[in-house]
Amino acid sequence: MALGLEDKKAIVAEVNEAAKGALSAVVADSRGVTVGEMTGLRRAAREAGVYVKVVRNTLVKRAVAGTDFECLSDTFTGPTLIAFSNEHPGAAARLLKDFATAQEKFEIKAAAFEGEVIPAADIDRLAKLPTYDEALAQLMMTMKEASAGKFVRLLAALRDQKEEAA
């Protein structure tokens, strides 16, 4: 079905707005994925705070022009699905990586974070970023372990001091 000029402008504006507010983006090829599977992906994306859209290459190139994701322009070939992470930089990468594992025909092309292209082979770098809560928990555990280590060293020093005095 042919899109009119106004429809194309609306799509470009919508994707551009999503790109401006996004932390990262992932580009994938969704050829061979059924409608039901795509519906499941879109549902999971909404829950994860990820914007997912299948867009024509010329329109998505126009939409990302002037954003951090302009570096992805070379990957816009063939059927293009683009996913923008709005809340966490690794959310879209994690979501699409899990989906690609379950669906053999779904292929991740590349990702972008802070204006840098991340090849599909290195998508784990982005997907494994801890969430805010996970990073906070890791920090607290490190601080807790450090204070426990200091306490143990203090007790050992007191023991050594008492042994020398005796």
Curated annotation (Swiss-Prot):
**Gene Ontology terms, MF aspect:** large ribosomal subunit rRNA binding; structural constituent of ribosome
Which Gene3D superfamilies did the record assign?
A: 3.30.70.1730, 6.10.250.2350
Question: What Pfam families does the database record attribute to this sequence?
Answer: Ribosomal_L10
Q: Which InterPro entries match?
A: Ribosomal_uL10, Ribosomal_uL10-like_sf, Ribosomal_uL10_bac, Ribosomal_uL10_bac_type, Ribosomal_uL10_CS_bac
Keywords attached to this Swiss-Prot or TrEMBL record, sorted alphabetically, are: Ribonucleoprotein, Ribosomal protein, RNA-binding, rRNA-binding
Q: Could you tell me the Gene Ontology terms of the biological process aspect for this record?
A: translation
Q: Name one GO cellular component term.
A: large ribosomal subunit
**Family from the record:** Belongs to the universal ribosomal protein uL10 family.
Q: How does it assemble?
A: Part of the ribosomal stalk of the 50S ribosomal subunit. The N-terminus interacts with L11 and the large rRNA to form the base of the stalk. The C-terminus forms an elongated spine to which L12 dimers bind in a sequential fashion forming a multimeric L10(L12)X complex.
Q: Which PANTHER family match?
A: 39S RIBOSOMAL PROTEIN L10, MITOCHONDRIAL
Q: What does this protein do?
A: Forms part of the ribosomal stalk, playing a central role in the interaction of the ribosome with GTP-bound translation factors.
> What protein is this chain from?
Large ribosomal subunit protein uL10
Q: Which organism is it from?
A: Shewanella woodyi (strain ATCC 51908 / MS32)
